Amino acid sequence: MKKAMVIINPTSGGEKALDYKEKLENKAKEYFEYVETKITEKALDATHFAEEASREQYDAVVVFGGDGTVNEVISGIDERDYIPKLGIIPGGTGNLITKLLEINQDIDGAIDELDFDLTNKIDIGKANDNYFGYIFSIGSLPEAIHNVEIEDKTKFGILTYAVNTMKSVMTDQVFNIKVETENGNYVGEASHVLVLLTNYFADKKIFEENKDGYANILILKDASIFSKLSVIPDLLKGDVVANDNIEYIKARNIKISSDSELESDVDGDKSDNLPVEIKVLAQRVEVFSKPKED
């Protein structure tokens, strides 16, 4: 008997997630003979539900929530020998993972388009004990770029990136950082560190195809507004690695430390202070989505 567990964060979708409960259950019942729904009430509920689904060998877990809820679910299924397939309905603010997978950002559309015959294996990152499906970062520039609205990008193009960058530079500072990997190290000043599990950033392809179990590490060495603005044209051209202000390393095992107390971020949510050890778990989770064309 095919079984699926639906996990819903009730605060998702502008706190209207439960309005979609019946529709999501009916969608799952088109494919699975048994569907059980769990509603989160507090932090880590999604992890515990996902652990149960893995332990009971459910065929799939379908989660309705933002990146934080999705990463809780990934944490729950990854800690087990059996990993159910994963469905994601975007219900958060950033929804970085579903955007990466090109899942419809409209809730009704995402449910309608959920195809349980179509899957895509993705890499997962683990930073200490925190999981992420897209990006680990230190510094405010990633948030500035993520927060550019699609409508603004369409209307104003590069100007929108520039305005958000100038806003972020006001609070930035350079810190001493040490990045250690199996493919090289970086020791020196930096204003931002990004660890990407994909070849895309801010909707732009900046690396070659990246389904190889490696993370792309970008270190912005200068906090000045001129350095940040110089990155934008290269980002839009998909050639950010060539920028003189960027240090680039590709690796699977990463340790980041600093002599300052620096906070990190995973998929838009606050994470541990440094030091952090990151491992890339290659092709770890099978997600219901169409394969992304490179």
From Swiss-Prot:
Binds 1 Mg(2+) ion per subunit. This ion appears to have a structural role and is required for catalytic activity. SUPFAM superfamilies: NAD kinase/diacylglycerol kinase-like. The keyword Magnesium applies. It comes from the Bacteria. Mg(2+) binds at residues 212, 214. ATP binds at residues 9-13, 40, 66-72, 93. GO terms for cellular component: plasma membrane. Its cofactor is Mg(2+). Residues 1-131 form the DAGKc domain. Keywords: ATP-binding, Kinase, Lipid biosynthesis, Lipid metabolism, Magnesium, Metal-binding, Nucleotide-binding, Phospholipid biosynthesis, Phospholipid metabolism, Transferase. InterPro entries: ATP-NAD_kinase_N, Diacylglycerol/lipid_kinase, Diacylglycerol_kinase_cat_dom, Lipid_Phosphate_FormReg, NAD/diacylglycerol_kinase_sf, YegS/DAGK_C. GO terms for molecular function: ATP binding; ATP-dependent diacylglycerol kinase activity; metal ion binding. It holds the Pfam family DAGK_cat. One of its GO terms (biological process) is phospholipid biosynthetic process. Its EC number is 2.7.1.-. The active site is at residue 269. The keyword Ribosomal protein does not apply. Belongs to the diacylglycerol/lipid kinase family. May catalyze the ATP-dependent phosphorylation of lipids other than diacylglycerol (DAG). In fact, is not able to exhibit diacylglycerol kinase activity in vitro. This is Putative lipid kinase SP_1045.
